[in-house]
Amino acid sequence: MGIHVITSDEIKKRLWDGANELRGSMNASQYMDYMLGLMFYKFLSDKTLDQVRATEMLHDLTEAELLERYEKLYNEYQEKYIKLIRQPLGYYIPPEYLYQRWMKDINEGRFELQIVTDSLNNFERTIASNQNPDDFENLFSSLDLTNQALGKDLNTRSKNIKSLIALFADLNMVALQKSDILGDAYEYLIGMFAMESGKKAGEFYTPRQVSEVLAQVVATSGPIASIYDPAVGSGSLLLTVKQHLSQQAQKELMYYGQEKNTATYNLTRMNLLLHGVRPEKMTVRNADTLAQDWPEDPERPNEACQFDAVVMNPPYSLKNWNSEGLTLSDPRFSFVGAMPPDSAGDYAFLLHGLYHLGQQGTMAIVLPHGVLFRGGAEGAIRKRLIDKNYIDAVIGLPSNLFTNTGIPVCVVVLKKNRSLGEPIVIIDASQYFVKVKTQNMLQDKDIARIIETYTSRIETESYSHLASLGEIKRNDYNLNIPRYVEPIKTEIPHHVDGHLYGGIPKEDFNRLPIIMSIAQDIVKNHLSEVREGFYKVKAIGSLQAEVLQSPTIETERKTLEDYINTFVEKYWNILKSVSSETNLADLKAVMLDDAKNLFADIPWVDSYEAYQVVAELWHQKLTTDLEIIAANDFYTAAIMTEPHMVTKGSGKTKRVEQDGVIGRLIPNDLIEHFLFSEERDKLDSYQADLDSLETELGELIEVAKEETSDEYNTLNDLLKRDDNDEVKDAFDAAHVNKALKELVKTDESFELVKKTYDLLDRIKKINKSIKDDRKSLDEKVYARFETLTHEEIDQLMWNKWFGTITNDIGKILEAPVLKELDILSMLNERYSDTLQSIDLEISNLEKSLEEMMKELVLE
């Protein structure tokens, strides 16, 4: 049967769908506190019961039996049992306040909302006596169960909270945490709520792709045993850094953070704990970072704690940040000899982080571009930082990455151990993104390009530059990126002579370096010289075909196909063999690097495009599939199925029902395509016939609605009507049938009504055939899962994972060539109309108008 595991994508979808269904009209930022808070309480309850199970070695008991046993043990050995649970967990929850007891009360029809309030209050009381109560204190302070946003009366609020409680009821939070699925789901929900919250999201969330840039910058710079985020938000930056460390480093990592907003501070602690961070490994404080310098070294109270990594996405250009009247006597600012202006707190956050950075550490902070060029006190601070050799890199990111602001931002990287004379890496990544709805997003390839450029310190035209101290001094310590990296010029200037007399200027062919290097002779053969130095393309279509079939392209295409086949063969065997011991993150990283190397020897292709193809394969298929395979084995997982649940009805009749089964790994339509092709072809043929008939019927409906048409008088009365007697876009079959019976064959209208009747009848019959054949094919597919051979599984899974990869990567080879051919076509069109031809056209039009005027007769 195999082990049915809930995958990361499945739990994310389930929880987010549930959130949207349950929250009603409550705004995202409000509902987030309730959903994430109760989800965390379920985690605490599951951990409590899991500790009881481990302590008593009750591994075979169901959850209900375990709850009953816990109640008995707790009542019998109360103080002793509290100690047994609290010691390893840092807290305890009495049985009457467990999440499982809430569900029991719900199922038995005696749930009251007060039990949730009592449970949360009891948790606060019990942890107050802990040695380190800060770990859990006031975690649920944002959950106001009397808030009328939950419902205007107690019954409505109780009903809404019960629905939310039920959403998490069957999730084993302990098992999900061990596989990181729980933490990932929690982080996903935070991100989704952030997008829904819009501007308010800036208080607690850094977009995942921005977190990745900062995390990979610091993680690739050296060993990390401690990490600090002075504007910690939800804690996502700390956790993203963790994911890029070795397993051993993750276990030993110490987390530090400070957050001013209390609700967000609670979110941080929950997020860290759900990601498996032990309470003793995290120190998070609810306070104003700039007003209250923290943390201090407890053994040396007058010295700052320093960390291996500092990451931060602080509020941008925070006004009036210095309400406490801080001065240069504050050691965070004294070493640069200038106070950041009260009107913008950007450098205040930067200097705070730098003050707490260890001598061998790396800091990465997200800031608005103004810090790179603004003058006054900020200019003095920037000069001091450059002279002291602290700034290691400046990375310009695209605009509109954040939900709370559209301004472009940059990442400033700082170190205290840079070599003397080492240049500053300046990267302009502002043009590398993909637009998703209204937001811009960095893709995997964009992040990889940034990190490789930074770590390898590569200079790339229009992308990166290594700026020396002398060069920066010549620019008056201005680090504005366009001073060092010239933007890509895509616009080709217009040539006056070309417009006047026609022809593409010879120098414009220098802007087509790819086709002029790989197919220069082919291009020249398709050009005719209009006059000296100006050309036109004879036939752009045949030129494109010949260039794409040129010997160079064909050779590279064949070589690339061989590379792809080798790549696929290698990873096909690796992916089939994953197990619970496989580190999927490491496997993904190696596979992506190998994909990038596919184009290493082809100079005109961006090798990161192949990187993205494989990254999308992981996002869309491999991540989920490999989680399932790792819990079973390849061939066992491949024949596993699950109920296909669909929502039917609406309103009070809305319900969820099973509609057959679907494969856990192998999609049903793949089995149809490869193993039941005849049946599928038959269905496709039916569908094509149906589409044709419905098009024909649609044309009749249109003329039946048109009062001026010949068919109106015959067909209009046969259309369906709504309650207001307005015609619908459909015929009433009963009316058509009745009309046909009343007409005789000699009537003028008979053929038209008969045609309508025949169309409706044929559509009805084809729909029945489709329904019957669809049901029959579905049943064959359901049964076929159990009898799939290893060879069939190999065929199906290979096509799922790699069926389109040769074509997808092959397109990358041709894309730059096609782009230049499009430019050539545009240039040919641009200079096709000369001044002489335009004058001639005007003259001809004037003559035509003159002739028409002569024919006008005044009556």
What are these regions (language model features)?
Residues 1-223, 283-289, 396-399, 428-429, ...:
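Non-catalytic, mostly N-terminal accessory regions of nucleic-acid modification and defense proteins
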Residues 200-312, 317-327, 332-338, 348, ...:
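Conserved S-adenosyl-L-methionine
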